[in-house]
């Protein structure tokens, strides 16, 4: 189950970011299976926030 601050990996290319990009969930949508993900660069610095549906991301353990 996803919740705020869950670490995730993207499964699709979106808004110029490749699949496999790592980030954290910063906001869950109440109206559907989607969330805002803060994407990180290779040094774990935040670079952007992008909306993903739950089937476009997976939890990183």
Q: What are the residue ranges of the model-derived segments?
A:
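Basic/aromatic-rich interaction segments and small domains that mediate binding to polyanionic partners
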Residues: 2-61
């Amino acid at each position: 189950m996803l919740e705020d601050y869950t670490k995730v990996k993207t499964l699709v290319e979106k808004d110029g970011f490749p699949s496999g990009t790592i980030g954290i969930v910063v906001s869950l949508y109440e109206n559907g299976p989607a969330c805002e993900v803060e994407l990180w660069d290779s040094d774990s610095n935040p670079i952007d926030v992008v909306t993903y549906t739950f089937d476009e991301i997976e939890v990183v353990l």
